[in-house]
Amino acid sequence: MRTLIDSALFVRDPEVVRSRAAEYGYLALRGIPGPEAVVPLCTLIQEVAESLGLLQPTRDARAAPLVRPGAALTGTGYDDARWLTLQERVLADPRFAAVGDCAELLTVLEALFAGPVLTRRGDICRLALPSATHLTTPPHQDHWYTGGTMNLWTVWIALTETPIELGPLAVLPGSHMSGLLPHAGHGAGRQGVRATDEEEFAAAPLAAGDAIFFNCLTVHRALPNVTRDRVRLSVDYRYQPANEPIHVVRVDGTRAGV
């Protein structure tokens, strides 16, 4: 597996930001938004997940929390009642919006789009339980699920220390240049593209507050959480240029969600 190329040194140079994004289909930014920015949100998610019986109590918001013994998500994970409750409670809390709207992220996105940014384009919080590799997000392109503008970008943020064995995000560099690929599969969030050689994906151990920006056509996946008892916590925020319309038609003319 390849290593992510860090672009954090270039975030103040819009031309380099756009050049790297066009070449790689992603931007890995270590320290952006940074650990302090995500502590309140991480604490919130841990508290809600604890109340739902998914996590053990913890006092260290930067360390990957421990799973509650016997906790597991049913079905595809996305249709588990506790997962849905987690989304409802977390996404409605100002601490979730505060991270997605922080200046550190929006500055990069404004450079990327060369203009104003539209937020709230499909945000979600995630937790990856151990012993649940069957629920690991398969390789896919976000455009398959969202449709709309080809300039939709996702920002994936690690909320705790996330070594490779905890299952961080992996991206396929340059895959955005191949257009929309065929997706297949059954169940919510389970449609994906044909498996690509794992060695072609890029990933890296991440610290709390590290972010990976990627285009809606960039093939990406989660790596499996192969730890014994730790839970990966992360969030996705999605953005597009404010001057482009919102719709769900894919580039091939089909409609997302159908």
Q: Which residue ranges define each predicted feature?
A:
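Catalytic core of non-heme Fe(II) oxygenases with the double-stranded beta-helix
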Residues: 107-110, 133-203, 244-254
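Non-heme Fe(II)-dependent double-stranded beta-helix
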Residues: 1-23, 30-139, 145-146
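Short hydrophobic-aromatic micro-motifs
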Residues: 27-29, 155, 212-214
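Non-heme Fe(II)/2-oxoglutarate
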Residues: 2-7, 42, 51-61, 72, ...
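A structural signal for short, well-ordered beta-strand segments
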Residues: 122-123, 155-157, 235-239
